[in-house]
Amino acid sequence: LALAGISVADTAPSSAAPAVLANVKAGETTRMVYELEAKAYVLFIPATGRAHFDVEMRPDTYNIKSRVKVTGIADWFVNYDMHLQASGYTRGDELKTYNYVSQNRDGKKNRRVNLTITDKDFSMTANPVFGNLGEPPATTEQVLKTNDPITALITFALEPRAPGADPCGGPLRIFDGRQLTYLHLKNAGTKQI
């Protein structure tokens, strides 16, 4: 088992991130492309994960396309290749999920999940269907307070924070069509990596 991650926080009061969503809402279409790579060892096998995010934000809507894949020798043992797409609404201080599609190409189930969240309800289809939806499954009230995984990540990076406030903010509320997750981040300070 291996775990790799990166956390970056800017606690400066004049951070440019809050301005991004405000500028988009004011009419400035913005496109961002993120490329991430993480390396770890699983037992003695080097594992590399790559993620690509293409984010386009317009004054009222946004669209995110992403691909996450394990590469190298680890790909022989862990066939993880996920294509993700999310779209929704641009608000002054956040993005809000309307539709999320994930297509897992793992060579086994190759599951496709389609999630739609409205102001009052949500619907989800999975093919093949999930064996269960968690115990207990997420309620409509819980899901309406969430975003899909990639929207939650991008919103976290862009949401405004008051000067001196915890740069990690509150929990990230995430729903992927099956699992409800409240991800609590902890500020570990600035580190030289």
Where are these regions (language model features)?
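Sec-dependent N-terminal signal peptides
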Residues: 1-3
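Solvent-exposed helix/loop surface patches that form functional interfaces
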Residues: 29, 110-193
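A broad structural signal for short, well-ordered beta-strand segments within beta-sheet-rich domains
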Residues: 94-99, 121-123
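N-terminal cleavable signal peptides for secretion/export
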Residues: 5-93, 100-110
